[in-house]
Amino acid sequence: MSKVTGKVSQIIGPVIDVEFQAGVDLPKIYDSLEIKKADGSILVLEVQSHIGENTVRTISMDSSDGLSRGAEVNATGSAIQMPVGDDVYGRLFNVIGDAIDGLGNLPKSGKDGLPIHREAPKFEDLSTSTEVLFTGIKVIDLIEPYAKGGKIGLFGGAGVGKTVLIQELINNIAKGHGGLSVFAGVGERTREGNDLLREMLESGIIKYGDDFMHSMEEGGWDLSKVDKSVMKDSKATFVFGQMNEPPGARARVALSGLTIAEYFRDGAGEGQGKDVLFFVDNIFRFTQAGSEVSALLGRMPSAVGYQPTLATEMGAMQERITSTKRGSITSVQAVYVPADDLTDPAPATTFAHLDATTVLSRKIAELGIYPAVDPLDSTSRILAPEILGKDHYSCAQRVKELLQRYKELQDIIAILGMEELSEEDKMAVGRARRVQRFLSQPFHVAEQFTGLKGVLVDIKDTIKGFNMIMDGELDHLPESAFNLKGTIEEAIEAGEKMLAEA
């Protein structure tokens, strides 16, 4: 097949129009095109629409600085490809599948690569089993348990702890799960990606070899000491398109990460599929970038200025994040909530696709309770006695009822004070405040902030602890004894100590 080439005819920021000769087959929608820039680097474009007889409108995956009209453009004949295979373990890629860890690019043509735009699995291929995924985080395991192979959303405004919670989940699940993890950094801070890589190296989820670790401990970052034979034992792969990237890259990087997760899930052949964890931080930036691209392409905006295709784009991606008979993808997605408004179209569209939602609340964060999960706003599809068992379900319902009662009484307390409450209500408020504080716990990834060692709490201990508080066995202990504690034994010990000192 002869190479199809065209010329740049218009450049408006990241939107580039390419003109081809008359009679040539135009590149298909979502095909990638390449421009060789003056400095020798290659700029990748993705076709978005066909204009007139022989022009395509594209969006660039990197900055269009230095481009000029008339530059030659080559059609690749396929969508953007991501490298797959055993060599991707422990590696960092960008949106177009190039390595960004300084360890050299991997081949991604033919059987070594997969296109980032793919169909979702067929209905008959989907898995229907339900299994609980325990995280060791009390509030999540008790109130809104996560399903293995399910989709989980962490909703929260700016600075309430989404990234810390997602890093704790990576720490708890990825270490305990022993399976593979794929992390897609979508339009977030580059520093967080850097911190995460260092943390993964220290915890042994990514392996660069002993020589490199010694150089890292001494404050260096000597890539010549990386042992590539050890690297294949790594349990994670990263794909980054951070907030300094143009909108084209941020709108596609979630799909690039998902492509690698799908490859791990389905394997190269029958019976080779695996259980994969897919972390996305932050899915809102995917929507935000889609809105920027939509505006740049001249589409009429929809509600609150979002793209008219918001639900379609979100659905096309979310339907691919699913579990099949070959393997499962359990995805954890952080969702930024603009101005703490859960009815904003971006978070509201995401809600429809999830099995469990963890809503982080600024009011709870202000009380110093971390993780700042709102137990009354958070939901789970699998919170049912036939899946979790009677004890777990009834304990979760009692906790919710108690906290709901406390919420209703707060207006009365604010106006009239505690004295005006009946004895029964006073007791309920005291227990609710203890329950609220006991829902907090110290995190491994936040040790440097809290000075407390992180804990994983078994679900049996969690249920026992909350039942003791609600049954009134611990009414004599001060409320502050329950804050940032793991098990109920720790809280009792701290409470007895406080009483002795008083």
Curated annotation (Swiss-Prot):
Q: Name one GO molecular function term.
A: ATP binding
What sections of the protein cross the membrane?
Answer: none
Q: Where is this chain's protein located in or outside the cell?
A: Cell membrane
Q: Which UniProt keywords apply?
A: ATP synthesis, ATP-binding, Cell membrane, CF(1), Hydrogen ion transport, Ion transport, Membrane, Nucleotide-binding, Translocase, Transport
Q: Fetch the InterPro entries from UniProt.
A: AAA+_ATPase, ATP-synt_VA_C, ATP_synth_F1_bsu, ATPase_a/bsu_AS, ATPase_alpha/beta_chains, ATPase_F1/V1/A1_a/bsu_N, ATPase_F1/V1/A1_a/bsu_N_sf, ATPase_F1/V1/A1_a/bsu_nucl-bd
**Where would you say this protein principally sits, based on its record?**
membrane
Please describe what this protein does.
Produces ATP from ADP in the presence of a proton gradient across the membrane. The catalytic sites are hosted primarily by the beta subunits.
Q: What is its quaternary makeup?
A: F-type ATPases have 2 components, CF(1) - the catalytic core - and CF(0) - the membrane proton channel. CF(1) has five subunits: alpha(3), beta(3), gamma(1), delta(1), epsilon(1). CF(0) has three main subunits: a(1), b(2) and c(9-12). The alpha and beta chains form an alternating ring which encloses part of the gamma chain. CF(1) is attached to CF(0) by a central stalk formed by the gamma and epsilon chains, while a peripheral stalk is formed by the delta and b chains.
List the protein's name. Answer: ATP synthase subunit beta
